[in-house]
Amino acid sequence: MAIKKFRPTSPALRQMTVLVSDEITCNQPEKSLLVNLKKNAGRNVHGRITVRHRGGGQKRKYRIIDFKRDKDGIPAKVATIEYDPNRTANIALLNYADGEKRYILAPVGINVGDTILSGLGADIKPGNCLALKDMPVGTIIHNIELKPGKGAQLVRSAGVSAQLMAKEGKNALLRLPSGEMRLVSINCKATIGQVGNIEHGNVVIGKAGRKRHMGIRPTVRGSVMNPNDHPHGGGEGRSPIGRPSPVTPWGKPALGYKTRKKNKASNKLIVSRRTK
C-alpha cells in the first residue's frame, strides 16, 4: 500500500495523489454477487432533492457483502481481494467448503489462500468472526453488530477499528473510533482485526473532475445565491449574511447546533460521548 505523487505538469497534478494498492489481486468481480445499482442523484420517490451535491459519476454495480457472517463452523478460503467502488474498504471473496461464495470486508493482514472461520471455536485472528462474549478483553475488532443477527452496522470504513474494553453482564463495553464508549449486547458478532486500506484517508483528490467522477457535485456558498435560494443570499456585491450567525438553507443554526434527539432510545447505552 503506497501513496503515489505526480510531477506537477498541470495545476491539478501538483497536489493530487492516488493509492497504489498491492493488496488487490483481481480486477473482475464475482458475477453472482453483483446487482444493478440505480442512480437517484439525491432525489426521493417524489423527485425532490433530499441530499444535495449528488449526481452524475461513473456507473457502478453493487457488490453484495456478507455483514451477518452466519455460516458458523464452515471454513472458507480467501480467493481474491478486490476493489469496491461503493465503499472505502477493499473486499475479499471467500470460497466456503460447501461451495458458496461470499464477499466480506478485507481486514489488515488477510492474504489470498488464508482460511477464515465464523462462530464459536474460531481463532482470534484477522478475518474471523465471533460473538463478543467469546472474545478476550482488549481485542481489536471491526464490522460490529448493534442487534444480534441483524448484521454489522458499526466500524466498517477503511482503516478503522474498535476495541473490546470490558464485558459486564449482558453487555460488552466498546471503544469506537470516534472515542465514544458504548455498550453492545455480548451476543452481537464482530470481526477480528482492523479494516484494511488504511492509507485511504491520506489520498488528496486534487481536482474537481475527480469528485465529479465519484458522483459528487459542487458545493455552492449561500452568500452567492439569490435570497429565494438561501437565507445568506441577495445584496449588492459581496454583502454580509445579515445575521448574527450562519444558518443552513432551511434557516437552522449551522454551527454548534445539536441535531441528535434528546430522548433517543440508545442514549442509555452510551457511557461517554465521542471525543472528536
Swiss-Prot record:
Organism whose genome encodes this protein: Clostridioides difficile (strain 630)
Keyword terms: Ribonucleoprotein, Ribosomal protein, RNA-binding, rRNA-binding
Basic residues bias locations: 258-276
SUPFAM superfamilies to which the protein is assigned, alphabetical: Nucleic acid-binding proteins, Translation proteins SH3-like domain
Molecular functions per Gene Ontology: rRNA binding; structural constituent of ribosome; transferase activity
Quaternary structure annotation from Swiss-Prot or TrEMBL: Part of the 50S ribosomal subunit. Forms a bridge to the 30S subunit in the 70S ribosome.
Biological processes per GO annotation: cytoplasmic translation
HAMAP family: Ribosomal_uL2_B
One cellular-component annotation, GO: large ribosomal subunit
Chain spans, region Disordered: 219-276
A Pfam match: Ribosomal_L2
Function comment: One of the primary rRNA binding proteins. Required for association of the 30S and 50S subunits to form the 70S ribosome, for tRNA binding and peptide bond formation. It has been suggested to have peptidyltransferase activity; this is somewhat controversial. Makes several contacts with the 16S rRNA in the 70S ribosome.
PROSITE patterns hit by this protein: RIBOSOMAL_L2
Entry's family note: Belongs to the universal ribosomal protein uL2 family.
Protein name stated in the entry: Large ribosomal subunit protein uL2
Gene encoding the protein: rplB
